[in-house]
């Protein structure tokens, strides 16, 4: 089956198509799935995607925010999204800024988000 890679900046997509997508690195190793998208209401932009990784059957997994610009999206020949590709090793993800499911970071404070963007080498949109 032919696949197409789409950059996150290359168009518009329904957020419900992104949530639940499997995430893997270019080696094909599973990095979890997209749990949610955090929205910056003041700016009207997506702050980051939240990845769940490391648990078993949803138990004990840690949540990792990742800037959308760090993903590529893989679509099948019909254009349906199949997976997100994140160009990191598993250890890089394990050492990324993250949090437990019940301990959401203070999203109004950009200090945490800045650490996330720096970890992935992404330019924060609020510094444009």
Positions of PLM-derived features:
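Peripheral interaction segments used for macromolecular assembly
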Residues: 1-128
């Amino acid at each position: 089956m032919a696949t197409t890679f789409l950059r996150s900046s290359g168009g518009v997509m329904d957020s419900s198509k992104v949530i639940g997508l499997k995430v893997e690195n270019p080696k094909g190793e599973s990095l979890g799935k997209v749990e949610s998208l955090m929205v910056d209401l003041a700016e009207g932009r997506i702050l980051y995607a939240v990845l769940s990784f490391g648990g078993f059957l949803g138990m004990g997994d840690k949540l990792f925010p990742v800037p959308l610009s760090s993903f590529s999206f893989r679509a099948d020949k019909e254009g349906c999204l199949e997976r997100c590709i994140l160009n990191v090793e598993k250890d890089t993800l394990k050492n990324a800024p993250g949090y437990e499911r019940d301990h959401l970071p203070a999203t109004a404070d950009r200090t945490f988000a800045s650490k996330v963007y720096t970890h992935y080498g992404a330019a924060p949109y609020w510094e444009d």
